[in-house]
């Protein structure tokens, strides 16, 4: 018989946390699982690093065409460890994309996309698209020459789509040309819309993996 604290007993009575803990800690792991099955988890870690460092940078970044570049320069040169925070953000972004690509290849080569895991694969593909969108929107935020022309090119791509192309370009840019409205939209996408979308699909992805388990060997 084990002694438990009153606090533990209080939560146990209402939430049955011991059953939850047992379920989490006793999940069966197939013997064929190796280090390559950790690529999805590494991608998640990279996202968490992205979230933490990105949140830290929002304290100093100013999303205006006149102050964006100077605020990034201030972060890099005057803020204590600001250069490190931004560098870690950039490095982990590259690492996240690399781990995502390797994870997709691993799942495809081991047949993890087959029945009954089709929806798990679909949510993974959606998350891959969102991850690339993070890169596109984040690249523009310093609003330097590279960022400006990248936005101009990327936001003009939908113009090739019949009927709705011009509307989509104007929606992305916030007008006929690239400017303050464009930067505001990309900043909103990068810091609010895309993180929430990724979190929702990530939760769905993990719940389905938890329910169906890890796919077997080929």
Swiss-Prot record:
Which cofactor names does the annotation list? heme b; heme c
* Protein residues bound to heme b 2: 89, 190
Tell me which Pfam families the record gives: Cytochrome_B
Q: Where is the major localization of this protein?
A: membrane
Record's bilayer topology term: Multi-pass membrane protein
> Per the annotation, how and in what number is the cofactor bound?
Binds 2 heme b groups non-covalently with two histidine residues as axial ligands.
Q: Which residues bind heme c?
A: 38
Annotated binding of heme b 1, by residue: 103, 205
Q: Which GO terms describe its biological process?
A: photosynthesis; respiratory electron transport chain
Molecular-function annotations in GO: electron transporter, transferring electrons within cytochrome b6/f complex of photosystem II activity; metal ion binding; oxidoreductase activity
What keywords sit in the KW lines? Electron transport, Heme, Iron, Membrane, Metal-binding, Photosynthesis, Thylakoid, Transmembrane, Transmembrane helix, Transport
* PROSITE patterns for the chain: CYTB_NTER
- Subcellular localization(s) per the UniProt record: Cellular thylakoid membrane
A cellular component term from Gene Ontology for this protein is: plasma membrane-derived thylakoid membrane
Which CDD domains does this chain map to? Cytochrome_b_N
The UniProt transmembrane annotation reads: 35-55, 93-113, 119-139, 189-209
Q: What else is known?
A: Heme 1 (or BH or b566) is high-potential and absorbs at about 566 nm, and heme 2 (or BL or b562) is low-potential and absorbs at about 562 nm.
Subunit description: The 4 large subunits of the cytochrome b6-f complex are cytochrome b6, subunit IV (17 kDa polypeptide, PetD), cytochrome f and the Rieske protein, while the 4 small subunits are PetG, PetL, PetM and PetN. The complex functions as a dimer.
Known NCBIfam families for this protein? PRK03735.1
Family, per entry: Belongs to the cytochrome b family. PetB subfamily.
Q: What does this protein do?
A: Component of the cytochrome b6-f complex, which mediates electron transfer between photosystem II (PSII) and photosystem I (PSI), cyclic electron flow around PSI, and state transitions.
Stated name of the protein? Cytochrome b6
Q: Which organism is it from?
A: Prochlorococcus marinus (strain MIT 9313)
